[in-house]
Amino acid sequence: MVKIAIFASGSGSNFENIVEHVESGKLENIEVTALYTDHQNAFCIDRAKKHDIPVYINEPKQFDSKAAYEQHLVSLLNEDKVEWIILAGYMRLIGPDLLASFEGKILNIHPSLLPKYKGIDAIGQAYHSGDTITGSTVHYVDCGMDTGEIIEQRQCDIRPDDSKEQLEEKVKKLEYELYPSVIAKIVK
């Protein structure tokens, strides 16, 4: 069994999708050790509890520095013998302490066809751009914002009659297929 930890900051729909793939056996030989979140009121906590997944709530403001915050996370991850970190809507840049401890073992999913539309509101950026396609990207995490090596992408059309909400649903559907597929290929 490969032990993974999933990091999320918000609703946790990608987190729950991965957990459901593990529970159903579609993601074999993977154990989700815990959800790590940086917001005490994040909805992902409710999703984790529903699936009996332990939750670590660590808000960076509780620590003297980003280094202290990340060193605390590394100690928790090491206690659980975590081998891979899966970012699923975790809205913080990963710093040098976490990167050094899990080099080449941190994945992220981003709702655009990187390198386009890095950062926040990527779907909104694509929607307002005039582009006719967008999509989702899974990539390795490095010290930049959505700059790590791209592993795989999936795309969808942006139709003239799509609302932003419809486009968000299209991209979310891609993510729900893409992330478990990449995890199955990479996390071993």
From Swiss-Prot:
Ligand binding ((6R)-10-formyltetrahydrofolate): 66, 91-94, 108
Molecular-function GO terms, alphabetical: phosphoribosylglycinamide formyltransferase activity
Gene3D superfamilies registered for this protein in UniProt: Formyl transferase, N-terminal domain
Binding site for N(1)-(5-phospho-beta-D-ribosyl)glycinamide: 12-14
InterPro entries from the UniProt entry: Formyl_transf_N (IPR002376), Formyl_transf_N_sf (IPR036477), GART (IPR004607)
Biological process annotations from GO: 'de novo' IMP biosynthetic process
Keywords: Purine biosynthesis, Transferase
Record flagged with keyword Transferase: yes
Pathway: Purine metabolism; IMP biosynthesis via de novo pathway; N(2)-formyl-N(1)-(5-phospho-D-ribosyl)glycinamide from N(1)-(5-phospho-D-ribosyl)glycinamide (10-formyl THF route): step 1/1
Enzyme class, UniProt record, top EC level: transferase
CDD domains: FMT_core_GART (cd08645)
Site (Raises pKa of active site His): 146
Domain of life: Bacteria
Catalytic machinery residues: 110
Signal peptide from the UniProt entry: none
Catalytic activity: N(1)-(5-phospho-beta-D-ribosyl)glycinamide + (6R)-10-formyltetrahydrofolate = N(2)-formyl-N(1)-(5-phospho-beta-D-ribosyl)glycinamide + (6S)-5,6,7,8-tetrahydrofolate + H(+)
Claim: tRNA-binding is one of the keywords in the record: no
Pfam families: Formyl_trans_N
GO cellular component, one term: cytosol
Listed EC numbers: 2.1.2.2
Family to which this protein belongs: Belongs to the GART family.
NCBIfam families per UniProt: PurN
Its job: Catalyzes the transfer of a formyl group from 10-formyltetrahydrofolate to 5-phospho-ribosyl-glycinamide (GAR), producing 5-phospho-ribosyl-N-formylglycinamide (FGAR) and tetrahydrofolate.
Stated name of the protein: Phosphoribosylglycinamide formyltransferase
Gene of this entry: purN
